[in-house]
Every structure is written in structure tokens, then in C-alpha cells.
UniProtKB/Swiss-Prot annotation:
Gene Ontology cellular-component terms listed: cytosol
MF GO annotations: carbohydrate derivative binding; glucose-6-phosphate isomerase activity; monosaccharide binding
Recorded catalytic activity of this chain's protein: alpha-D-glucose 6-phosphate = beta-D-fructose 6-phosphate
UniProt-listed Enzyme Commission number(s): 5.3.1.9
Keywords, in A-Z order: Cytoplasm, Gluconeogenesis, Glycolysis, Isomerase
InterPro entries: G6P_Isomerase, G6P_Isomerase_C, Phosphoglucose_isomerase_CS, SIS_dom_sf, SIS_PGI_1, SIS_PGI_2
Gene for this chain: pgi1
Function: Catalyzes the reversible isomerization of glucose-6-phosphate to fructose-6-phosphate.
Name by which UniProt lists this protein: Glucose-6-phosphate isomerase 1
Residues of the active site: E353, H384, K512
Native organism: Neisseria gonorrhoeae (strain ATCC 700825 / FA 1090)
NCBIfam families: PRK00179.1 (NF001211)
CDD domains reported in the protein's UniProt record: SIS_PGI_1, SIS_PGI_2
Cellular location(s): Cytoplasm
Pfam families, alphabetized: PGI
Amino acid sequence: MKHLHDLPAWSKLWNHFDDSKTLHMREMFEQDPQRAERYWLQVGGLTLDYSKNRINDETMSLLFELAREAGVPERMRQMFHGEKINTTENRAVLHVALRNRTNSPIMVDGEDVMPKVNRVLQRMGEFAHEVRSGSWLGYTNQVITDVVNIGIGGSDLGPLTMCTALKPFGHPRLNMHFVSNVDGSQLRDVLSKVHPETTLFIIASKTFTTQETLTNALTAREWFLNHAGDEEAVAKHFAAVSTNRKAVAEFGIDIANMFEFWDWVGGRYSLWSAIGLPIMLYLGEENFIEMLNGAHLMDQHFINTPLERNLPVILALIGIWYINYYGGGSHVIAPYDQHLHRLPKFIQQLDMESNGKQVTLDGKAVGHETSPIIWGETGINGQHAFFQLLHQGTHITPIDLIASLEKRSNLPGHHEILLANVFAQAEAFMCGKTPDEVRAELKAQGMDEARIEELVPHKTFSGNRPTNLILMDKVNPRNMGSLIAMYEHKTFVQGIIWGINSFDQWGVELGKQLAKTILGELTGETEPQKHDSSTERLINLYLQTNRK
């Protein structure tokens, strides 16, 4: 395989970095009146302004050269054609098949997967229609008013993010709840708000053996049976998203209400599959299809557009520029829409679980940085929390500022204030404020010269802080589909360049394996095992505390 450090463009970019690292965006804008127009892209309902980055035409040309040398176009083609690019698990990676709206054949091991995809999608639609229309009744013949999704990781974050983001499109009768944490308090809080006669539980676990999910599911089942009293009633109030028919049936769920997905669908890429059942229940089949349409639009743009005008590719390459050359170890997601407040967490899992890898596809140490730490908060809240560090801290931290052009509420003045802040922050991060500008400002306030000089260093902003401004014409299912697909493909491209497998997650497994051993010790079911001295003391502390 090709190793990043051996690619000619990698070295060329280091030389270019040494020559260009002192350039300031403020000067680049002054010298180039066409800069904003040139570094601007529109795809469907999304607009990307990437002009406020530490790049010029030479930077982008070399980054595109790097992408080609790393085999990005070929790897993209392999994914869309169902080749097994998840090499450590010997699996195809085909979340794009789930939103293949042309219905053209996509082959895995000689079989077209589209008939299966369409069949599950049709069954989801029929089930959602029954629940939403009120024809699906609980064990006391009442309509469903609450849906509780029990899952973890991709079985939780994707549906939660979409249902929250698209709340204005949700069914007015349905209240959506999501349980992922096994600590007990989250499930207890949800159960205290719902009624067994009118609640539908969705248990989302591919194997139906995930410890956290099954623990919560069994507790929910016990709570339900304490009220219903009849195990046959479980079938009216529980559905499953799984592939384990036997375990689902043993749980008491009617197999007719089990919705499958496949091993070529990774958890963090699965909201388009049956894992998205809560989304379809809440938004309806038509809006779910619109979400798929938006993702398909981005897929087609991604696979058919030259790298130089390819939105996910450009975002990926700009990220590589900061991570691997500037040493930018984190990236902020700042949506300026309260309904998008779950988006940073979703992208955190997508990026960090995909690209938080230390070896290349052939098992060698990567020798360079991979995934940045992804973090964030709604933009307005972030301005009053961590934007101080972004403006005047010592780190270089790229920021995605995400907003909607169309108002989401009818409250006068609110959206204008919001967008004014988005645009102002992007400008402030880029321009900063020079010492001379600070002096002039303080002098106009009548401050004496000695005091001015004391304050100048504190009120100076270096600027040159990079941002991507991502605008949706409106927040709707179609644009949300495009937005999520954009980030999926960005993550994939970065993984290609780093030479890693973006579609496994072995780092999730080790702690889970050790937890099984320790659980037996905490419950007294197994004899104490050999651990390091710290872990042994922690186990003993727990046992002593709970003997009291």
C-alpha cells in the first residue's frame, strides 16, 4: 500500500507550509478580491464558504495532488462498488446503498443488496404508518403516545440527533425518548414519564447481546410486565432492530416486528438503515425518504464531482492541512441552531471512532496524527463558554460554524441576531484586532495613554483563526441528510489519506472484555482475578463499601 510519508505531495506540502505559515488571511483577502467567490461551493441546499482558511491556490493544488497520490478516487470507487474495504473484518462498506434512490444494483459477493434494502424500508414504512395513524394499539387498545429507543453508540446517536434536529417535522402525538446509559438513572427517568399502555419500546442491537442495551431492555420489559401482567402483551409494545431472530423471539418480540440490517452497515453509519426506525416513526415515511434523498444527492456529488469542486473532499483536505501540518489536534463543531445541539456528539463518534487509529491498513505504525478530538456546542452558548480559547488561546483549532438561512421560529428579531453572530464570529476569527486598532478604540473612549498600553496586549486578537461556514438554506430532512452524508464522506477521505481503516473499532472491545471479568468479581459470581494493584484496590473498595 501507499504510505503517506512516501508520497511526493507530502514533502511538497511541508515545503509549502514552511513558505506560507506566516501568511495572514486578512492580507490574503485584501490582495485577492475574488477569494470568497473562488472558495465557495453549493451542493443542493448546502453552501460551504471555506475562504476563511489558511490556504491559497497552491495549498489546495498540492492537497488535491496528495489526495490523488493517496488513491482517494480509486478508494471511493471501491466503496461504491461493494468491495470489502473494511479489511480487518473482511466486509463491504455500503451505507450508500441504504440511500441509493436510483435503485441501481449494488453487488456484494455477487448478490444485489438493493432488494433487501427496499424490502426492509417498505416494512419500516408500513409499521410507521400503523403507529402514526393510530391503528397500532397497545394491550389496552390505546394508541401509542411514547416511543422509547434503547440502544447505544450508533444505535442511539444517529436517531437521537435526527429526531432532535427535525423536531418541527415530528408527529404531534409522539414523544421520543432515548436510553443508552446503563447506569439506571436514564432509564428510570424515562420510565417515570411514560405509561405502559401507550409506550412502544424499540430495542436496537444487531446481535441482541450488547450488554448495556440488553440490560436496559430487560429492565424495561420487567417494568412493563409489572403493569401488564401478561407476557403476550410484550408483542404489542416492543419492536427490535436486529439480526438475531432467535434471541428476539425469546425476548417475546413478534418476529414480524423485527427489522434487520447487515454486516456491511457500520453502527456509526447506520441511521439510514432500520436503526433509523425511530426517525421514521417520528417524522413519517415521506420525510425519512427525503432524508435519504438528501444523502443520495451528496453521495452522487461525492462520487461524480472532480476533487477540485468536491465538497466532502475539500473539507477533508483542509482538515489534513491543519491536523498534519499545523498540529491542530482538535476540531470544533458549532451549530447555530438549538435543535442541532446533538450534532457535535454525533460527529464526534463518526470521526473519532472511524479515524482514531494508530496503524495503517498493513499494520504499520502510522507515524503521523490521525483523527482530531471533535468537540463543540451550540454556537451562541459556545461564545459564552469556550470561544475565548478559540480567539486568544495558544491552540490552532479549526471551527465548523453551521447555520440555517431560513428562520425556524416566528419570534421577531431572534434569527437576525443569531446570524449576525455567526457571520461576526467568522469575521472576527479571521481578522482579529491589531494593536493599533485597539489603541485607536481605547483612545476614542478617552483613556489615558499609560492605561491604553497596559490593556493593548490583552485586547489584541491575532486573528488568522480558521473557520468553515456551512449554511443550509433551511433545516429540513433533505438538507440534514446531505449534511450528515457530507461529514461521513469527509471522514472517509481523511482515513484514505492516512492509510487507515475507517470502518472498524477494535478500541471499543478491550474495555468491554475486561469489564466482563470484573463484573463477576463485583457481583461475587467469580473468584478474584489477578489485576494490577490499582484495579485490585478499586474492586476491594467497591466490595467493602457495599458490604456495609
